[in-house]
Amino acid sequence: MYRPNKFQAYQNGAVFTASPAQLILMLFEGAVRFINISLEGFNHQDPLEFNLTINQNVQKAQAIIRELKACLHEDKSPEFAQRMTALYDYFDRRLQEGNLKKTREPIEEVLRHLHVLRDAWKEMTLRQSQAGASALTPASAEAVGQWSATS
């Protein structure tokens, strides 16, 4: 008999009841988490653990970044979507470079950028929920787009 653990059930409930903005925040947090785990892999002395930890977790972060890219709505804010697409493509290339060469710097760079994006998204989500809106507006999205154009 299958009995899901309570934490898994809680997580599933959180995903199913989350707003679109909260789901995006969860994706950012997941990407940050997997990149942090991949960076821990650089501390492994065993070559197999070193390579597996980095590779598997970088690939998970890349999959999340591709999902973030798929969530963009070009019809609502084409300029923002183009900027974010370019940024996510850059993140994907840098993660791939760090994974292939097994170097920390490109992975750490993506992590720094994801922290900024996640924190900005979290702030916008909080402001929107305080204002009583259930989703972010294109104007809010443009604020992130303006940041991405300067980085």
Model segments located where?
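Acidic, low-complexity proline/glycine-rich segments
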Residues: 1-11
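Amphipathic, well-ordered alpha-helical segments in soluble domains
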Residues: 27-37, 57-67, 87-90, 94, ...
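Alpha-helical segments in soluble extracytoplasmic regions
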Residues: 42-68
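Short helix-adjacent coil turns
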Residues: 45-49, 98-105
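Short, charged, amphipathic alpha-helical segments
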Residues: 52-55, 81-85, 107-112
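Short, solvent-exposed, charged loop/turn and helix-capping segments
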Residues: 67-82
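Preference for long, well-ordered alpha-helical segments
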Residues: 104-151
